[in-house]
Amino acid sequence: MTAPRPMKLTALHHKHLALGAVMVDDSGWQRPERYGSPEEEMRAVQAGVGLCDISPVGKLDLKGKESASLLGRMSSPSTVPRVGQAQWTVLKTTDDVGGVEGLCCRLGSDHLLVMTGLDTVATAEQTVKQHMAVVDGCVHLTNLTSALAAVQLVGPYSRDLLSKLTALDLSPRRFADLTCAQGSVAQVYALVVRADAGSELAYEIYCGREFAEYLWDTLRDAGQEFGAVPFGVVAQRRLRAKA
């Protein structure tokens, strides 16, 4: 008999099961592969708006006066974003042999949040620690992967949906691709990141795990007029691959 192995569940796991999702193991996390046909999910997203549980993405929080210079050391000074901006970057190991891709959000002059892939967060965390060991100054690293839930909105009506629930100015001029801001979403303190998925308009909303179900339900209710549908990892990867 094969011994069971640990499996991580997001705060929205039971919501997915209630919607009839087919679950799949994704780097040790149970995630919805699909709710129905991935092709139908993609069509619905491209015509309206879709919701995807992206809570398992790696989330490394860096705080301290030297956090920006540390990021510059791991990647390059030119890839350190300004406050309120996000930037795709590669975190290089201290020996420059390898690296991990991540999306770095500059939340303050001394505060960064780096998102990584599900399967690379441990490597990214170790890479940060290696650089911290040889850099003078104050930097604090916290792995928030399991502490923060995250929902991705994708589709032409994602801005309309999110605007119903937040006072943040999401206009294209003020909130272009790779912009980030903290504020209230559905009366919950959250981080909003615009990170377009391929050619599709997309936002990522990060909040405390304890508010995940409330946020998911509120987004689905507010999105009914736009035909909002949940979509799984198959559709997510296909959308991301479509440039």
Regions found by a protein language model. Give the residues of each.
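Basic, glycine/lysine-rich polyanion-binding surfaces/domains
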Residues: 1-243
